[in-house]
Amino acid sequence: FSMFASLSIGYNHPYVLENKDRLTAAAINKPTNSDIYSPMMAEFVETMGRVAQPDYLPYSFYVSGGTLAVENGLKTAFDWKVRHNLAKGKGEKGSQVLHFKQCFHGRSGYTLSLTDSPDPRKVQYFPKFNWPRVTPPSMTFPLNENNLANIISLEEQSLNEIKNAI
């Protein structure tokens, strides 16, 4: 099951209904597959670059889904950080990911180590990395005096946990 972020748009949105044939063709050709290029993917990349991609970020990489986006982002960060540290003579460092508790980033490879599964039986026998996990400074609404004091306290706690982890 997926679509947590996009389900709010829904299947009955007028754009979806008006473009169902085009969207069906896109689904059949999977335009986000970066190994097989289609005219639809080329159109998408051109539109995304024109509308949403700033000039100072000249490259783009598309994957199918949030979990794989996080996974590929982590691999990119590991690669960059380790190379950066090697070039500075600091050795092969850069494979730790500091992250918040109570989070969900998916259930594939690296993301399992970042996700709190509500049912531990789903992932209990999967190998995971023991990466530093800190308290999230989550806001509670309405943002009244008590809730504001609580978020300030949680932010301080989170910063202290980050400092201790580093």
PLM segments and residue spans:
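Short beta-strands and strand-loop turn motifs
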Residues: 1-2, 135
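Glycine/serine-rich anion-binding loops at beta->alpha junctions
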Residues: 2-3, 64
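A structural motif shared across PLP-dependent enzymes of the aminotransferase-like
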Residues: 4-23, 34-47, 113-116
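Short, flexible active-site loop motifs that bind/organize anionic cofactors or intermediates
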Residues: 6-7, 31, 59, 152
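Short alpha-helical transmembrane segments in multi-pass integral membrane proteins
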Residues: 26-27
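Generic beta-sheet signal
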Residues: 31-33, 100
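PLP-dependent aspartate aminotransferase-fold enzymes
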Residues: 46-166
